[in-house]
């Protein structure tokens, strides 16, 4: 098998279990062994050490245990000192490389985030951070070569989630001036979606005095029987919103499968995801770091940009992909512009104070620090103007070479936009084609971009008036109807 096909940006992803029609297993035992060998060789070259200490963790996926066993055995056979940490979160696995008197040299997290039950994957970490796409390419290249077995390896069992939870608890206690029960009297519910996030209710909130009654789906179950653990999905946010309102909670928290993303709900049922989530953490950080830059992905609203500017911040809209926004934040800091936050509307949030690690639990902890200090989260959102309407369409690219075809469509759109009355191409856009439309032509904007990994052109539309999204779609319809390499039917049907 060509292992390079398992690369998905800075991760490895594949089908790990049979059972879905037309989805043959690609991340099988042989592939895991080869990749483990490639990672061992990669570490030897990168760290300059013959023997490394490596931690291995997994989320609740059904295939996780078997993959972990194979991974640990192979790494040990390559001379590594391996500790299997069992059920963990992705952020916690990175923290094993920077925590304690003897941090691990590297970590591997077994997860496929929010993908279906039959999928799984691998994320790689050292103390320098998560692997880049180029690192994963090199690991898979080395994996295709013969595994370099070496003596001296071992496999042990361990536990880290209590250590990680203690770090989060201490942050909240410090924000409350040392009060050991800073959340006493607060009712906070968690929806873990049967992923790895149940620990947050049991090991963070409850020990700090919070009432967590009404929390949902805390038990790990890799079948994900209740809803997909993905804060971007309406059904997931509906679940935590329902939990908050039914239990009359003060606050609600929802995580994705491996807890590198989060969303939240206020006591009145108002959802904190996408633009609201970014606005809330931006307001907190701009109070603490006036003038700092906030890097976001490309589909944030005009109202969010105005909110960040009104709070004295510098908004840098960048390309989708959590590694992209993190790397842009690192670049800004290196260039002399303080940047405290890299965040996506998907719920990935990486703070400078936390190793620029995208960590959903840490993001929520920052909100709980405000609550513990007696501050109102609702007041922090005052002044955020939100669009009246927003829509997203996913236009399938029909051509085999989808990148070339998608790029050609975007190039054509950029030229087309220049000739349209009431249209203006956004000057601060770094991905796809973003066009602002005046009041007579829809009073909003649209963004057409190429998906990071899939043969899709996502189309986002926002308008500041009722029926404005349909007006904008109608403005764009003549162009879309001419594009033979894409299926634009969903957007075109919306115009009817």
Task: Give a label for each model feature.
Residues 1-71, 77, 154-185:
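An N-terminal, well-structured beta->alpha segment
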Residues 41, 53-119, 203-265:
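N-terminal small/polar loop signature for handling phosphorylated ligands or for N-terminal nucleophile
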Residues 49-59, 83, 187-189, 292-298, ...:
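Short glycine-rich phosphate-binding loop at a beta-alpha junction
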Residues 59-65, 115-116, 193-198, 259-260, ...:
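Gly/Ser/Thr-rich loops at beta-strand to alpha-helix junctions
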Residues 76, 85-86, 90, 141-170, ...:
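Proline/glycine-rich low-complexity loops and linkers
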Residues 101, 118-244:
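Gly/Ser/Thr-enriched, mixed-charge loops and adjacent short helices
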Residues 289-496:
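Phosphate-binding and adjacent anionic-ligand microenvironments
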């Amino acid at each position: 098998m060509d292992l390079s096909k398992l690369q998905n940006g800075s991760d490895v992803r594949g089908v790990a279990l049979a059972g879905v029609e037309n989805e043959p297993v690609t991340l099988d035992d042989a592939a895991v062994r080869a990749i483990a060998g490639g990672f061992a060789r990669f570490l030897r070259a990168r760290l300059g050490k013959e023997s490394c200490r490596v931690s291995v963790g997994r989320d609740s996926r059904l295939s996780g245990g078997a993959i972990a066993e194979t991974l640990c055995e192979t790494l040990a056979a390559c001379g590594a000192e391996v500790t299997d940490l069992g059920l963990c979160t992705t952020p916690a696995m990175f923290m094993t490389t920077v925590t304690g008197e003897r941090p691990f040299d590297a970590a591997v997290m077994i997860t496929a985030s929010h993908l279906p039950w039959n999928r799984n994957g691998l994320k790689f970490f050292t103390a320098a951070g998560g692997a880049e796409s180029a690192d994963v390419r090199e690991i898979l290249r080395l994996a295709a070569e013969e595994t370099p077995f070496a003596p001296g390896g071992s496999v042990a069992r361990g536990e880290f989630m209590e250590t990680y939870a203690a770090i989060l608890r201490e942050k909240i206690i410090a924000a409350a001036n040392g009060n050991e029960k800073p959340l006493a009297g607060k009712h906070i519910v968690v929806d873990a979606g049967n992923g790895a996030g149940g620990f947050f209710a049991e090991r963070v909130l409850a020990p700090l005095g919070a009432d967590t009654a009404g929390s949902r789906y805390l038990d790990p179950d890799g079948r994900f029987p209740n809803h997909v653990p993905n804060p971007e999905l309406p059904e997931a946010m509906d679940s935590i919103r329902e939990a908050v309102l039914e239990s009359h909670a003060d606050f609600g928290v929802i995580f994705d499968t491996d807890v590198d993303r989060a969303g939240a709900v206020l006591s009145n049922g108002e959802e904190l995801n996408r633009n609201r989530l970014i606005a809330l953490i931006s307001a907190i950080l701009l109070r603490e770091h006036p003038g700092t830059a906030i890097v976001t992905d490309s589909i944030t609203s005009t109202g969010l940009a105005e909110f960040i500017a009104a709070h004295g911040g510098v908004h840098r809209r960048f390309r989708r992909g959590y590694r992209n926004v993190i790397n842009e934040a690192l670049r800004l800091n290196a260039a002399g512009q303080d940047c405290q936050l890299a965040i996506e509307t998907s719920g990935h949030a990486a703070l400078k104070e936390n190793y620029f690690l995208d960590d959903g639990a840490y993001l929520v902890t920052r909100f709980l620090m405000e609550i513990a200090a007696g501050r109102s989260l609702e007041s922090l959102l005052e002044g955020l103007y939100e669009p009246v309407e927003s829509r997203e369409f996913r236009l399938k690219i029909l051509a085999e070479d989808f990148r070339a075809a998608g790029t050609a469509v975007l190039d054509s759109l950029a030229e087309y936009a220049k000739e349209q009355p009431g249209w203006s191409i956004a000057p601060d856009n770094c991905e796809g084609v973003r066009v602002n439309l005046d009041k007579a032509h829809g009073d909003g904007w649209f963004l057409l971009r190429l998906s990071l990994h899939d043969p899709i052109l996502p189309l986002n539309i926002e308008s500041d008036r009722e029926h404005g999204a349909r007006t904008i779609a109608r403005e764009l319809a003549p162009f879309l109807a001419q594009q033979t390499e894409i299926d634009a039917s969903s957007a075109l049907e919306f115009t009817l």
